[in-house]
Amino acid sequence: MSRICEICGKGPSFGNNVSHANNKTSKIWRPNLQKIKAVKNGTVRSIKVCTRCIRSGHVTKAL
């Protein structure tokens, strides 16, 4: 569970790079994960959270 947000479960997306000659190579879009110290279930833990969850207030940072 290394590249998955622990709050919303967002993970990598898969697709293709497509050139003008219509050649396709595989591509991975990874979420912007940040390792932060947050309060979860009353305890302070270091968790990986995507920036959207941090920005929208789904997680409270520990002081």
UniProtKB/Swiss-Prot annotation:
> From its record, what is one biological process in GO terms?
translation
Q: Which UniProt keywords apply?
A: Ribonucleoprotein, Ribosomal protein
Cysteine disulfide links? none
Could you tell me which Pfam families the record lists for this protein?
Ribosomal_L28
Q: Which SUPFAM superfamilies match?
A: L28p-like (SSF143800)
What one GO molecular function would you report for this record? structural constituent of ribosome
Sorted alphabetically, the Gene Ontology cellular component annotations on this record are: ribonucleoprotein complex; ribosome
Cite the InterPro entries for this sequence.
Answer: Bacterial_rp_bL28 (IPR050096), Ribosomal_bL28 (IPR026569), Ribosomal_bL28/bL31-like_sf (IPR034704), Ribosomal_bL28_bact-type (IPR001383), Ribosomal_bL28_sf (IPR037147)
Report the family membership: Belongs to the bacterial ribosomal protein bL28 family.
**Protein's name according to its UniProt entry:** Large ribosomal subunit protein bL28
Question: From which organism does this entry originate?
Answer: Citrifermentans bemidjiense (strain ATCC BAA-1014 / DSM 16622 / JCM 12645 / Bem) (Geobacter bemidjiensis)
Q: What is the lineage of its organism?
A: Bacteria, Pseudomonadati, Thermodesulfobacteriota, Desulfuromonadia, Geobacterales
Q: Which gene encodes it?
A: rpmB
